[in-house]
């Protein structure tokens, strides 16, 4: 499995999802990013079993494949590279990874992508498109009030409610309570859910 990708683009996408990674995982495979190639699209994922985040970017590739790559080591390598194409060569037999650039080669030991936890399918899902600035502002205005008590998971996140006439974000740690409402964001289908705090930070 070989592919070529922009080092800066890859670092940007990995930086977006690395917040999900834990410093002490019960499953060693969770210390890795999952790389999944289909056609010319690379999907990178990170998970802590509770939250999984994924991002996609374009690559040059002639074959599909799946590999788990050590997250910390890969981030450090990419931070030391200037923006130019880098080549990943993956041995499917022993999961050895060679990253080549104009400045040298790096060798890593990866893992089978099949070991990475599968993301459960969402039944009866519905989707909604919102302006990213609206979501970002709503999170910034409410997240600081969320608690961090793992024994009370309902309070360690941000409650989001979408209605036909507004969007409401609520967060509390039992001492302070914040409600942020937007009248310029609407949803045809009313729904509510709790965003875990960790991936929002």
Regions found by a protein language model. Give the residues of each.
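Structural preference for solvent-exposed beta-strand-turn elements
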Residues: 1-201
């Amino acid at each position: 499995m070989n592919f070529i990708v922009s080092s800066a683009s890859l670092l940007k996408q990995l930086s977006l999802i690395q917040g999900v990674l834990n410093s002490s995982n019960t499953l060693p495979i969770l210390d890795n990013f999952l790389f999944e190639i289909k056609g010319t699209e690379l999907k990178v994922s990170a998970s802590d079993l509770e939250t999984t985040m994924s991002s996609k970017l374009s690559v040059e590739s002639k074959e599909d494949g799946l590999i788990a790559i050590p997250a910390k080591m890969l981030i450090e390598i990419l931070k030391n590279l200037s923006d130019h194409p880098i080549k990943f060569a993956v041995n499917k037999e022993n999961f050895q990874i060679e990253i080549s650039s104009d400045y040298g080669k790096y060798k890593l030991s990866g893992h089978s992508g099949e070991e990475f936890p599968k993301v459960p399918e969402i039944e009866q899902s519905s989707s909604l498109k919102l302006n990213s600035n609206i979501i970002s502002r709503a999170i910034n205005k409410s997240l600081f009030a969320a608690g961090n008590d793992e024994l009370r998971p309902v309070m360690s996140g941000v409650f989001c409610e979408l209605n036909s006439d507004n969007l409401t974000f609520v967060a509390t740690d039992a001492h302070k309570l914040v409600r942020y409402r937007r009248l310029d964001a609407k949803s045809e289908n009313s729904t509510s859910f709790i965003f875990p705090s960790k991936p929002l930070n």
